[in-house]
Amino acid sequence: MKRTLSIFLSVLTVVVLTGCKTCCKSSCSPSPFAQYDNITAVQKLELKRTSESWDGAALPDYLKGKPELVVMRYIFPVGSKLPWHHHPVINYGILQQGELTIVGLDGKRQVVRAGDAIVEMVGPIHCGMNTGDKPIVLDMFYLTQKGLPLAVQHPEVQKPME
């Protein structure tokens, strides 16, 4: 009986420790911000300053009227593709995780990786795809006005993303 209990407790310990290691794996991986854990003073880092979108086009003038600021977090599964769309308003963001490939209707492409700042195209039709091996987490900031869409889809565009 004692031997059976001892074996049972040993097996239970292995299962619990193995299970815990498996379930806690994501929390054990290093934070992308671990490099800042030991700073002793406030730091400021300019991630991006531009008047152009990622494809080199000049950003439009600001809208007239009362602004509405919108912050969105997008999460894209591995291999997912966004439909062809355009943005009627200025928007920019930070890719927190993953790898995003953006393709313009004209064929221009941009690969964005975790930690990169991105300034989106305003007006031109484009699409995006998760080309990495983990889900994308993308935080985007929109400078818009109440009632304006953040994006307009173009189902009429049948061009495959290459």
Feature locations, PLM:
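Bacterial N-terminal signal peptides that target proteins for export
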Residues: 1-8
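A short beta-loop-beta micro-motif enriched in histidine and acidic residues
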Residues: 64-67, 79-92
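Short beta-strand segments in beta-sandwich/barrel cores
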Residues: 81-82, 99-103, 117
